[in-house]
Amino acid sequence: RLRKNGETFELTKKLALSTTDASIQEEQILVLTAEEYQFFAQLEGKKIHKTRYRYEYLPGEFAEIDVFQSALSWLVLVDFEFQDLAQKDNFSKPERCWWDITQDATIAWGILAGKSYQDILPLIQKYDYTPLFLT
């Protein structure tokens, strides 16, 4: 994943550490210069455009709220990351978060790249998802 956050540029890769639990991953981050970021950004390929917001839902505990743009502009997903398995196992999702899609390979980030609402509608109907339009 190629990311820009203000004047910080990164190339991120997630590695699955478990074949049975998609939430157990290692993230490798390569810090880029602005020039390196621009080089990767101009490459052809499937892309996702989104704005990420950090929300402190408990003291010291943050959720990352992804508001998608372009063809997926109706989609909002929330990501929770944990320091260890005990924290993950003791987590209770906030009531405003409706479904846990962690183990759903049809909604994994790589799968969403290059897709539109119409493309993934059949995959998300099982969640009775209501599109969220922000103005």
Where are these regions (language model features)?
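Phosphate-end processing signature that detects enzymes handling 5′-triphosphorylated RNA
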Residues: 1-135
